Amino acid sequence: MLTSTLLAAATTPLEWSPTVGIIMVIANVIAITFGRQTIKYPSAEPALPSAKFFGGFGAPALLATTAFGHILGVGLVLGLHNLGRI
């Protein structure tokens, strides 16, 4: 009984499109900007090669901001898909 209700509530899977990619890129840019303003020690060790290319971030800050950006992006994509916008 519960399984049939769960299957009836399931939506169609979202296919990748350039719109999804653009949303993910924008979400990551927002997360990196937010991280640049709020991370206390952005250049913590281990350092990345070509620090200027990565905005002076160390590996922990870069991983943290991009992970946060992916969480934001997935939330946006799934939310917009659920609303029927994409």
Swiss-Prot record:
InterPro entries, A to Z: PSI_centre_PsaK_sf, PSI_PsaG/PsaK, PSI_PsaK, PSI_PsaK_bact
Species this chain originates from: Nostoc sp. (strain PCC 7120 / SAG 25.82 / UTEX 2576)
Family: Belongs to the PsaG/PsaK family.
Any one Pfam family match given in the protein's UniProt record, by short name: PSI_PSAK
Lineage: Bacteria, Bacillati, Cyanobacteriota, Cyanophyceae, Nostocales
GO biological processes: photosynthesis
Membrane-traversing stretches: 14-34, 60-80
Keyword field contains Transmembrane helix: yes
This protein's record includes keyword Cytoplasm: no
Protein name: Photosystem I reaction center subunit PsaK 1
Alphabetically ordered keywords of this record: Membrane, Photosynthesis, Photosystem I, Thylakoid, Transmembrane, Transmembrane helix
Membrane topology category: Multi-pass membrane protein
CC per GO annotation: photosystem I; plasma membrane-derived thylakoid membrane
Major localization listed first in the record, in broad terms: membrane
NCBIfam families in the record: PS_I_psaK
Self-association state and partner proteins as the record states: The cyanobacterial PSI reaction center is composed of one copy each of PsaA,B,C,D,E,F,I,J,K,L,M and X, and forms dimeric and tetrameric complexes.
Propeptide: 1-8
